[in-house]
Amino acid sequence: MITPYNILRHELIGLDVEITQSTNKSLVGLKGKIVYETRNTINIERFDNSKEVMIPKDIAVFKFKLNEEYIEVIGELLMGRPEDRLKRKIKNIYPY
């Protein structure tokens, strides 16, 4: 089960997400469902028009919906291949 404490080591595909901050202002407020993830990007299928958008992880802050609560994660913490991120030991530097 995904919790705010293990989200960095969990599969992200299928989660609802919103971009809350980004260096690219046109991405802020984008909402959708994660459909694909690579080492440096996350692909989101938008809720409003079902188009797929590729978001670089290092320029954004993501707000994930977990059950009925929300958690914000800095995109740089998600960098790396998904299968390697699941194995990587993560320091407890991110306050929840």
Curated annotation (Swiss-Prot):
InterPro entries (alphabetical) = RNase_P/MRP_Rpp29-subunit, RNase_P/MRP_Rpp29_sf, RNP1, Rof/RNase_P-like, Rpp29/RNP1
Question: Which Enzyme Commission number(s) are on file for it?
Answer: 3.1.26.5
Q: Mention one GO biological process in which this protein takes part, according to its record.
A: tRNA 5'-leader removal
Q: Which GO terms describe its cellular component?
A: cytoplasm; ribonuclease MRP complex; ribonuclease P complex
Localization, UniProt: Cytoplasm
Does the keyword section mention Zinc?
A: no
Homology family = Belongs to the eukaryotic/archaeal RNase P protein component 1 family.
In its UniProt entry, what is this protein called?
A: Ribonuclease P protein component 1
Species assigned in the record = Methanococcus aeolicus (strain ATCC BAA-1280 / DSM 17508 / OCM 812 / Nankai-3)
Q: Gene symbol?
A: rnp1
